[in-house]
Amino acid sequence: MSAVTRCEDGLVLRLYIQPKASRDSIVGLHGDEVKVAITAPPVDGQANSHLIKFLGKQFRVAKSQIVIEKGELGRHKQVKIIHPQQIPPEIAALTE
């Protein structure tokens, strides 16, 4: 399975999360996953909620349109983005 997969109602992303980074960014490929750096620490779900907020801004969707399908408690996650309004260039390059 690739890092970015199109499905009928949006995109499925396989992510590797780097918490406690200096800034929020989509770093690029990390093996067969997309590496995302976020500033939040991995404590009490702070990293997950920060990740959802960050992805919501990047894809211009509401937070309710982003679902963590797998990896709620780990660094390796599978996230579904329902009907993205915009696709960031870092992700668009991987879908081709």
From Swiss-Prot:
Q: Where is the signal peptide, in residue numbers? A: none
Q: Name one Pfam family in it.
A: DUF167
Cellular component annotations (GO), alphabetically ordered? cytoplasm
State the HAMAP family in the record.
Answer: UPF0235
Family named by the database record: Belongs to the UPF0235 family.
Annotated NCBIfam families:
DUF167 family protein, PRK05090.1
Put simply, this protein is called: UPF0235 protein YggU
